[in-house]
Amino acid sequence: MGSTGLCFYGHCIVMFLLQMVTASSEPFIVNGLEGPVLASLGGNLELSCQLSPPQQAQHMEIRWFRNLYTEPVHLYRDGKDMFGEIISKYVERTELLKDGIGEGKVTLRIFNVTVDDDGSYHCVFKDGDFYEEHITEVKITAINLQVQIHVHPPNTKGVIVECHSGGWFPRPLMQWRDRRGEVIPAASKSHSQGRDKLFNMKISLLISESFFQKVICCLQNPLTGQEERTSVILSDAFFSWNRIWKMILGIILSMMVVSIFVFSCLLHHEHKVCKWKWDAPWIKGLLIMTSSMVTVVLVMVYLHMKQRVPVSDVHFELDTLWVEDISVILCSLMVPATMLVSYTYFRLKDWCQHNHAQRVFTSN
């Protein structure tokens, strides 16, 4: 009876130990944060994961990594943090909070978040040969409160307004709006990234008329929806140069018309031609000057309408000034050049007719 009792107690102890081993290696899954976790640039990031069902995890290996299992962001093994195995860019930047490790819950804290911290993080719990993981997606956000607007000097094509802002991540939505909030089509958009991988944004707007008295530059972070904006009010004075330029061209063209009329009258008076004949000198002179004026006007319109340089190019203003100078030069030279050509044509024609008449007279 005594030996039977000892065997019974021994069997109970063995069963208890087996139950303990089975409980300690109970299968589990790893739960964590669902959906993207947003973190501000330069701040701290906390990522949590927990075993289900809850159980103590002090004896387990807990590994956080990004792309490669062998390159841990943080590693916990044999009841301690293995700082020597952490990859270089996370050295002294991570901490594993283990207050709830008795229930299988840990939190990874990352200090001084950078753009490079954007992406996926794997949390792996390993117990012997059994392991499970949870993947958390991290999105880094950065905004710049400074949005600058630069207004260029007006030219014949209008006023160029540029908006600049740097230090954004990810690339923000950037657009122009009027005072009613409606979107204004931009002339150009561009962006660049520095070594810190932050986006530098630039958007340009060419305003040819004073219709948009107030323009607003808006930038919006696509993840947080946070928006920064600044505005500028353009008075009619910005567009006065456009009216002055049209007035100058109008005066020059008027002088050209008057010159054509005067020159035609002189030819008419000189040759005493009273009838409207297509071979009359004054009509030929009028046709020469009219065709010259039409040609110059067409060339000017072509130069002004053709966009050789985009608005965002640094040489856009230089190109516009070149067009203005060429237009003035063409208008200024057209009248004397056309009159000189006409005068030379008629003088040569008279000289040829005079020589022909002399040869005919001599032969007779």
UniProtKB/Swiss-Prot annotation:
Residues 1-23 form the signal peptide. It holds the Pfam family C2-set_3. SUPFAM superfamilies: Immunoglobulin. Coiled coil: none annotated. Expressed in skin and thymus. Residues 27-141 form the Ig-like V-type domain. The lineage of its organism: Eukaryota, Metazoa, Chordata, Craniata, Vertebrata. Residues 142-228 form the Ig-like C1-type domain. It comes from Mus musculus (Mouse). It is a multi-pass membrane protein. Residues 268-284, 347-364 are cytoplasmic. Glycans are attached at N112. InterPro entries: BTN3A2-like_Ig-C, Ig-like_dom, Ig-like_dom_sf, Ig-like_fold, Ig_sub, Ig_V-set, IgSF_BTN/MOG. It is found in: Membrane. May act by engaging a cell surface molecule on immature T-cells in the embryonic thymus. Plays a central role in mediating key epithelial-immune interactions by being involved in the selection of Vgamma5(+)Vdelta1(+) T-cells, which constitute 90% of epidermal gammadelta T-cells. Encoded by one of the 11 copies of Skint genes clustered in the D1 region of the chromosome 4. It comes from the Eukaryota. This is Selection and upkeep of intraepithelial T-cells protein 1. Its main location: membrane. One of its GO terms (biological process) is positive regulation of gamma-delta T cell differentiation. Belongs to the SKINT family. Keywords: Disulfide bond, Glycoprotein, Immunoglobulin domain, Membrane, Signal, Transmembrane, Transmembrane helix.
